[in-house]
């Protein structure tokens, strides 16, 4: 496995951080709702002849920026992510490590300004921002300053050397669950995907993953967000009209026959909605939330028997209540290992009296990684070669590694939806040796 992102790298001592910094001090009993704004440009000296020398503990600080939407429409998200980052700071960082939050205001322009302020504050690494447009705006600033970025986005279009994405990629999720499905008898797969760039990306990834394990995507249909659009997509992918017509034709052929065999056959047909199977034995449903519930409800309406067709999904299925949808029971999906994050979830709950945001594990792991690499003998190791170590890093989100092109890999487990929640049917691998690039 990779380097484990746990345990303090050196004893933590209490100190007063500079304005705008979150220093490596023990957690306070309460956390301010609004973090202080970093002071990038200190006031000038009282007289030009005075030479100001910072205290040794400030001069030796390893500064890392975290770019988050701390104001604007996404402020709640930004503050929730910052809470997880602070937990990593308290757990792992030593007293020389300082985390400086910069507000992107949830806009691309704000992200570029935040990146410029971070560079001016002499940071050595940037964590964040969250959204792909913010990453695209901030990256030129950090690259020009030769500072590497660990962003939260999963939009591979903004990845490049020096801009590493920690977001969970749909490509890796689909590759994992399709590989598992192929090893357990699934041969022909249909795909229900949302309209738009994400859906197109998911379909490309599914085709690539299926080809790699010798099976095929035989049908795909896009669905829009409304119930009628979802129903239409399910109707088309299931060949419902053709199968319905085949049933009516069978009934008509038998109705004129008076023998007992024909009558028994007609009785059997009378309880069916369609005649003949759907053209696949696995069905990818690239949906989450209300859309997933809506798709699940439509499957039985158009005679897709999920006892015969294995549903395959993404990590977004890892929500409470998935097992309440009968059509989803038995479905498989790939997700980060649940066991890795249990202690993190408990610690977060104890500190903040709430559950962590979905990006919380990534925030914790990236700040923990920064703290550990920042405390290496001989100085911080934030170079691209170290960040893209082949062995990777073991964090609360499981084993992960960055690739030289800026993308990332995660070792995922496969779970099955059950009435009582999802259960692990194949654990995540403990090393990257058996995982393809």
Regions found by a protein language model. Give the residues of each.
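Extracytosolic ligand-binding ectodomains
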Residues: 1-437
């Amino acid at each position: 496995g990779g380097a484990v992102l746990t345990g303090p790298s050196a004893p933590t001592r209490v100190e007063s951080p500079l304005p705008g910094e979150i220093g490596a001090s023990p957690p306070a009993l309460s956390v301010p709702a609004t973090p202080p704004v970093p002071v990038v440009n200190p006031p000038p000296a009282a007289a030009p002849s005075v030479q100001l020398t910072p205290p040794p503990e400030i001069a030796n600080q390893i500064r890392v920026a975290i770019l988050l939407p701390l104001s604007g429409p996404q402020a709640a998200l930004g503050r929730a992510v910052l809470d997880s980052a602070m937990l990593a700071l308290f757990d792992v960082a030593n007293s020389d490590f300082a985390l400086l939050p910069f507000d992107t205001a949830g806009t691309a322009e704000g992200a570029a300004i935040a990146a410029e302020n971070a560079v001016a504050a002499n940071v050595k690494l940037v964590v964040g921002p969250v959204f792909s447009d913010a990453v695209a705006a901030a990256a030129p600033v950090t690259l020009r300053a030769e500072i590497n970025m660990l962003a939260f986005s999963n939009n591979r279009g903004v990845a490049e050397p020096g801009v590493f994405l920690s977001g969970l990629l749909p490509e890796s999720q689909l590759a994992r669950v399709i590989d598992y499905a192929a090893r357990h008898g699934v041969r022909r797969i249909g795909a229900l995907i949302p309209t738009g760039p994400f859906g197109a990306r998911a379909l490309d990834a599914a085709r690539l993953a299926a080809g790699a394990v010798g099976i095929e995507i035989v049908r795909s249909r896009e669905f829009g967000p409304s119930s009628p659009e979802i129903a239409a997509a399910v109707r088309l992918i299931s060949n419902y009209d053709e199968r319905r017509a085949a049933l009516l034709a069978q009934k008509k052929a038998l109705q004129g026959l008076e023998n007992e065999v024909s009558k028994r056959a007609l009785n059997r047909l009378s309880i069916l909605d369609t005649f003949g199977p759907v053209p696949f034995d696995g069905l990818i449903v690239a949906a989450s939330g209300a859309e997933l519930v809506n798709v699940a409800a439509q499957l039985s309406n158009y005679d897709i028997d999920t006892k015969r067709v294995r549903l395959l999904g993404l990590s977004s299925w890892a929500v409470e209540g998935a097992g309440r949808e009968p059509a989803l029971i038995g479905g498989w999906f790939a997700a980060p290992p649940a066991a890795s994050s249990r202690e993190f979830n408990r610690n977060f709950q104890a500190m903040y009296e709430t559950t962590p945001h979905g990006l919380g594990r990534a925030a914790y792991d990236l700040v923990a990684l920064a703290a550990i690499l920042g405390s290496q003998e001989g100085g911080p190791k934030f170079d691209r070669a170290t960040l893209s170590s082949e062995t990777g890093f073991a964090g609360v989100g499981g084993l992960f590694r960055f690739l030289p092109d800026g993308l990332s890999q995660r070792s995922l487990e496969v779970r099955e939806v059950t009435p009582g929640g999802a259960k692990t049917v194949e654990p995540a691998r403990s090393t990257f040796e058996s995982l393809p690039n």
